[in-house]
Amino acid sequence: MNAKFILLLLVVATTMLLPDTQGAEVIKCRTPKDCAGPCRKQTGCPHGKCMNRTCRCNRCG
């Protein structure tokens, strides 16, 4: 019983610490300008970086 409780707490803590899944869709890019439109649709903010040919969207504020 005690081991199951600890495992449950570990799972809950892990899911709380993981980043939001918003913007998890893979967006292919070549330049940061390619990320502005798709990032605006996903996060409401056009801020994004093109890293390893995938967009990484940032949130505003």
UniProtKB/Swiss-Prot annotation:
Residues recorded with modification Cysteine amide: 60
What's an example GO cellular component term for this entry?
Answer: extracellular region
Q: Which InterPro entries match?
A: Scorpion_toxin-like_sf, Scorpion_toxinS_K_inh
**Record bears the keyword Transmembrane helix:** no
Gene Ontology molecular functions: ion channel inhibitor activity; potassium channel regulator activity; toxin activity
In which tissues has expression of this protein been reported?
Expressed by the venom gland.
Q: Where is the signal peptide?
A: 1-23
Keyword Transcription set for record: no
Q: Which UniProt keywords apply?
A: Amidation, Disulfide bond, Ion channel impairing toxin, Neurotoxin, Potassium channel impairing toxin, Secreted, Signal, Toxin
Q: Where in the cell is it found?
A: Secreted
Name which cysteines form disulfide bonds. Answer: 29-50, 35-55, 39-57, 45-60
User: Out of the domains of life, which is the source?
Assistant: Eukaryota
Q: Which Pfam families match?
A: Toxin_2 (PF00451)
- To which protein family does this belong? Belongs to the short scorpion toxin superfamily. Potassium channel inhibitor family. Alpha-KTx 06 subfamily.
- What's the stated role of this polypeptide? Blocker of voltage-gated potassium channels.
What is recorded about the domains? Has the structural arrangement of an alpha-helix connected to antiparallel beta-sheets by disulfide bonds (CS-alpha/beta).
What name has this protein been given in UniProt? Potassium channel toxin alpha-KTx 6.6
Q: Which organism is it from?
A: Opistophthalmus carinatus (African yellow leg scorpion)
